[in-house]
């Protein structure tokens, strides 16, 4: 049976649309619906590669997990990844379409709208219920003509809309009323309810205000979602929640690169007992860390130059000499090498830049982007898995330091001879299997900290989605929402 699509739109960015959409996905999955997520256009440096080798935003991966289905490219047909110099890489249905100047977006608009509709039609054929998510504010009147992800999608899908507003940042009533007022009459008719998100306090004291806002906008408030401390992956690095340690366990420092991407690579480490994760904003922040991670980058050469100019290069080399564990992922792996060559100008005008020299690799960028899921093996024969998203190829200059290889011999990771500096192209390496847990337990053993056996990461995430679903059921009128999808 086919049901009417439901759409979550926001009064602003970071109001919690992605998480509420994930909660809806989990709710409908547990109710027995064949449900899938869809977001026409995502702007994010945080991406994932599907089994088919297609690149999509991670928010829809989280939502697909909540639905217990495999992520597919049609769940996020347009992904825009900002680069340096006001450039944006445009990914359409999982593949790189072009890199454009941000101001040329209008020229692509018609084509992108066609592709978004095509993807929606495809996903609608495969599933009975689609939970749609918008992007940013749905009432940006200067963007109405070029809108793809918000009311344009609601119209294409003929979806009813639930408006999500964030009370934690203040001004929630003005943002709700202002958003509704700025919509056209046709758009307002689609809005069938409001969810007030991130509420702190007792609901009974808030009820009178809810009734007042209903009187003003003539739309029901379906409930208030409380501010919660669940471990649900955030969409972008601006809102990342890192888990700080108590000074008695493992301290992991993430070097905060200006063009950092795929920050979710280290999320799973933060759930491990006695592990704290924090950003290193300056070189001194590395001094007390037990492990340093250099994450992925959307502009590796620029970030490498930043490390040199900010003093991070010297600090990282010193920490390496002192035996500290340093781990580079993707762009971080390339940065740890001897040299990066960009003869084709893939990233910009700089054609060559010396790396930190901590790993024996030379990286050459090329026009083709590698996007695929991988299964590989380390030196001890342990399986590691994840996905690749990168331009270029890194060639070992000392084969005795090869650390991770695929069965076909393709090198995906290196270490130094002292075996305290490691790098790999594999995103998600800490998520799958027990690689991350083994690494942390090795550190714990060295520091005389009790080792721990953690719950499987997939099971852990499912438990978090279940708790999120419980919060939704307890606080939001989901019977009303179910009536909407059956109307």
Curated annotation (Swiss-Prot):
Q: Where is the GATase cobBQ-type domain?
A: 249-435
Disulfide bonding pattern of the chain = none
Any one GO molecular function term: catalytic activity
Q: What metabolic or biological pathway is this protein involved in?
A: Cofactor biosynthesis; adenosylcobalamin biosynthesis
Q: Which GO terms describe its biological process?
A: cobalamin biosynthetic process
- What are the alphabetically sorted keywords of the record? Cobalamin biosynthesis, Glutamine amidotransferase
Spell out the protein name for this chain: Cobyric acid synthase
